[in-house]
Amino acid sequence: MNAHTEKLTVQGPAGLIEVLRDRPEGVSRGHAVIAHPHPLFGGTMDNKVVQTLARAFVQNGWVALRFNFRGVGASQGQHDHGVGEAQDLLHLVGQLAPEGALALAGFSFGAYVTSHAIEALHPQRHIEKAVLVGTAASRFEVAPVPPELHDRTLVIHGEADDTVPLASAMDWARPQGLPILVVPGGSHFFHGQLPQLKSWVSRHLSAHE
């Protein structure tokens, strides 16, 4: 953790939720809530892809909120196959980012959870940016991205992802006409490519509508 990282606990729907809040230098652009990969396969808020997403947001002026899903780390409760996890995410938005600019991001299972959080929040809550990485479309019913958010959404997938095949992500995106940034040779965890991942996310965050 760096000097601008705070550890928080928030009372959630299934008990306490463990949160890390990373703050940027100066005035922030808003809050970004970042969801981690599958808890039953070792996913936590300390996952390297999740940390990379947080760094990209912080370096672009956002407060990054990482959290452990229910039953992970110090977060209470039990794994709920994405349903309760989406409730946790929405609860954190209400508690820690109730107003102002909001961005949502997720990796793998976290992208699945984030897709349903977007579905629940839109259009009542404006979502400034969305980032979905290694979206677990082969394993879960990922919600479509509302057409109004396509220009504000970055979907990244590794060409050589052997956890979530690229074809499944394409099958999810194709009916929506939603572009995917395909990383040549990229694995599910973007081994050796995390600096490039951060660069692509930063470029998305710095783009103006």
Per-range role (PLM):
Residues 10-12, 16-99:
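Serine-hydrolase catalytic machinery in alpha/beta-hydrolase-like enzymes
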Residues 37-38, 131-140:
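Active-site nucleophile loop of the alpha/beta-hydrolase fold
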Residues 104-106, 133:
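Short beta-strand immediately N-terminal to the catalytic nucleophile in serine-hydrolase-like folds
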Residues 106-114:
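Gly/Ala-rich beta-loop-alpha elbow adjacent to hydrolase catalytic centers
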Residues 138-139, 159-164, 188-189:
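Acidic catalytic loop of the alpha/beta-hydrolase fold
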Residues 149-150, 155-157, 161:
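Short beta-strand/loop motif that positions the catalytic acidic residue
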Residues 159-178:
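Conserved loop-alpha-helix segment in the C-terminal half of the alpha/beta-hydrolase fold
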Residues 186-198:
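Catalytic histidine-centered segment of alpha/beta-hydrolase-like enzymes
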